[in-house]
Amino acid sequence: MNSASRITLFFLLTVLITQECLSSKGEDRLFRRLFRRYNQFIRPVENVSDPVTVEFEVSISQLVKVDEVNQIMETNLWLRHIWNDYKLKWLPAEFDGIEFIRVPSNKIWRPDIVLYNNAVGDFLVEDKTKALLKYDGTITWVPPAIFKSSCPMDITYFPFDYQNCSMKFGSWTYDKAKIDLVLIGSKVNLKDFWESGEWEIIDAPGYKHDIKYNCCEEIYPDITYSFYIRRLPLFYTINLIIPCLLISFLTILVFYLPSDCGEKVTLCISVLLSLTVFLLVITETIPSTSLVIPLIGEYLLFTMIFVTLSIVITVFVLNVHYRTPMTHTMPSWVRTVFLRALPRVMLMRRPIDLSESSGKGGGEIAGSSGTGGGRGAEGKKMKSSASQQGAMNSLEFGEGKAALEGKKGGCPCHPIKEAIEGDCGKVSRQLTPQAINTVVTFSVVSPEIKQAIESVKYIAENMRSRNKAKEVEDDWKYVAMVIDRIFLWVFVLVCVLGTLGLFLQPLIGFFS
């Protein structure tokens, strides 16, 4: 570095140091002059009857918390106060051109503006921040403060709720004749607002009021800011509403599960237990208040009733499903309603037994073993045809007897054997009680054959009774299936309409 550069650098440093010293001395002289005889307890007015005009503005930095249980809104605010103090004026030319000076706020007179609806903490802001003083006496004081204001909340539509929280600022001791508040702007300053993850500020207008209280004759001005906030429902939708919807649809699946699997009640109890555990987990999330029932609370109660009714109905369906002819007799109206009318309405088609569809003109066994949905007129027709066929069998075996008696010569056993062998196909095809009785009555057979025929008759009667019992059991099972299908659609409609009805209420209330 050459000598010229060194001289230039030294000259600049000297000028800066000298100017700083002069500025410090000028500011010190100004401070001593301003506060030599200043009294911070006296209102800064030349005429005692004149009010001090205080311009007031609120800037919100952060919406810290909204406590629904205690009904408190916690905010971080910057309060801008602007007023003029005639005793704090100076000429900048006399003090090295100083136009602004920062002074401790406890050294000057300050308006005692407090938050009227403060819930917790101090009503006054702290005086640790400095005030900006201008040469013409204008004072700007912007103290930051964290307020916990009381806010009556309506959580009826939680978590889709809107809240209106007000903050009322005003002088606590000075009436309008002493301090006149002027609102800066028409709403809260949101330029430095940090977005909250739970709440959104829709609007925050400000209003000035002049109120006469019962305690005093004077009129007191105040500035009230109304914070219109909306809860962001994404967190509650994912953690509350969607699990409840899934549990509700699991309840619907109970009615689609077949009764024979034996897991219907198990599924119902599992859904109820899962809902109970879920309610225990989210108890701290839901606002615990007895003033109103929140929307999510109504939906959880709706889901609980939903699951409980599904258990009751499932027990009833299982009771119907496992009924037998030995314990219950099916009334005719049940057969008409649940076996004929309702299946058509519910678009249910009962499969027809193959034996019935393949041999409609067969014997009584085939007719009685069919599992078709309608057993009224068709069953009667089958029974009448079976009785006619029994009479035909009697006639046929009667002719066989006459033929046997018409035989002459030889052992009587041979004609009997031939007659039996000749009619064997008919007996095997139409094994009815009439046919068996005809064989036993009009045939001269050995005791062994009679015993065999009686055994066949017993087996046929047993098979017939079992088939009839099986038919009745199948009818009861089909009735249970119809009831299941009815409640399946009923629960689907109730679940969809109930969900839409509950969660459309906030939207309807907002537009109304």
UniProtKB/Swiss-Prot annotation:
Membrane topology reported for the UniProt record: Multi-pass membrane protein
Binding site for Na(+): E263
Tissue expr: Expressed in retina and brain.
Disordered: annotated segments: 356-389
Keyword list, A-Z: Cell membrane, Disulfide bond, Endoplasmic reticulum, Glycoprotein, Golgi apparatus, Ion channel, Ion transport, Ligand-gated ion channel, Membrane, Metal-binding, Receptor, Signal, Sodium, Synapse, Transmembrane, Transmembrane helix, Transport
Protein name: Neuronal acetylcholine receptor subunit alpha-3
Regulation: Activated by a myriad of ligands such as acetylcholine, cytisine, nicotine, choline and epibatidine. The heteropentamer CHRNA3:CHRNB2 activity is blocked by alpha-conotoxins ImI, ImII, PnIA, GID and MII. The heteropentamer CHRNA3:CHRNB4 activity is blocked by the alpha-conotoxin ImI and AuIB.
Cytoplasmic topology ranges: 259-260, 319-482
Transmembrane regions: 243-258, 261-277, 300-318, 483-501
Organism: Carassius auratus
Signal peptide span: 1-23
Family to which this protein belongs: Belongs to the ligand-gated ion channel (TC 1.A.9) family. Acetylcholine receptor (TC 1.A.9.1) subfamily. Alpha-3/CHRNA3 sub-subfamily.
SUPFAM superfamilies assigned to the protein according to its UniProt record, in alphabetical order: Neurotransmitter-gated ion-channel transmembrane pore, Nicotinic receptor ligand binding domain-like
Quaternary structure annotation from Swiss-Prot or TrEMBL: Neuronal AChR is composed of two different types of subunits: alpha and beta. CHRNA3/Alpha-3 subunit can be combined to CHRNB2/beta-2 or CHRNB4/beta-4 to give rise to functional receptors.
Chain intervals with Gly residues compositional bias: 359-376
Any single Gene Ontology cellular-component annotation: endoplasmic reticulum
Disulfide bond entries: C151-C165, C215-C216
Residue intervals annotated with topology Extracellular: 24-242, 278-299, 502-512
UniProt GO MF annotations: acetylcholine receptor activity; acetylcholine-gated monoatomic cation-selective channel activity
Reaction catalysed by this enzyme: K(+)(in) = K(+)(out); Na(+)(in) = Na(+)(out); Ca(2+)(in) = Ca(2+)(out)
Location, primary (coarse class): membrane
Gene Ontology biological-process entries: behavioral response to nicotine; nervous system development; signal transduction; synaptic transmission involved in micturition
Glycosylation positions in this chain: N47, N164
InterPro entries in UniProt: Neur_chan_lig-bd (IPR006202), Neur_chan_lig-bd_sf (IPR036734), Neur_channel (IPR006201), Neuro-gated_channel_TM_sf (IPR036719), Neuro_actylchol_rec (IPR038050), Neurotrans-gated_channel_TM (IPR006029), Neurotransmitter_ion_chnl_CS (IPR018000), Nicotinic_acetylcholine_rcpt (IPR002394)
Source lineage: Eukaryota, Metazoa, Chordata, Craniata, Vertebrata
